């Protein structure tokens, strides 16, 4: 069995992923703000470096997998922090741990995006470019300015919805771009993303008010299966992507959303290559 890092391991999808991986016999190095093997704040450069350093020490410099699950939701009032935590945090961590992954016989990495990247019509293309360009200071400044320009009623209801959806889209694009580079693909480090939908976690309840007693048919987006997801539904796919047998899948974005994206964008995938 392998050594696998799981960020956001103290609650929600991260906790479910860590539990499933431990049950499968893996050694899990959890990363979170509390109750984890590595306690670090991935929202800033210092915390990210602390996390990388401690993970490398605990793992002996060899990792078989990384599951970047940690993130914050659209109800967070600081849009700049959302950009840092949801995009720059996982990207910096994965880049910092790439060398340790390369030393494994079957290295795997998976990150958590969101179906909000394709179902929320508030993507900030400028912010996407700044994120993919790696300019965190400019991205934070832009996210804060864009948030202040939103209608007050929207800021009150979901203060960082645009920054949230945009950060998750940029993260999915980073995965697809990065997975096929020689530094990842030709080194055998497989990198994929999961795009969850309405999953009953503290993050979703805090963002939407939906809990286990909430009627799925009253949710703002379509719920074709008539149920909400559970953290364990995401943990299942995290484990699948990290398995050594998953040897021919990289650069994928898997929607685990009960059919929401398919209901809203039935012809969006696959997209034909234009001549």
Role assignments for model-derived ranges:
Residues 92, 163-165, 169-172, 193, ...:
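C-terminal helical subdomain
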Residues 67-74, 259:
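Conserved NAD(P)H cofactor-binding loop of Rossmann-fold oxidoreductase domains
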Residues 67, 110-112, 191-194, 204, ...:
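Hydrophobic structural elements of the Rossmann-like NAD(P)H-binding subdomain
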Residues 72-76, 102-186, 198-199:
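Catalytic loop of short-chain dehydrogenase/reductase
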Residues 33-50, 55, 71-72:
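Rossmann-fold cofactor-recognition segment
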Residues 250-275:
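Short C-terminal tail/terminal secondary-structure segment
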Residues 10, 14-19:
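N-terminal Rossmann NAD(P)H-binding glycine-rich loop of SDR-like oxidoreductase domains
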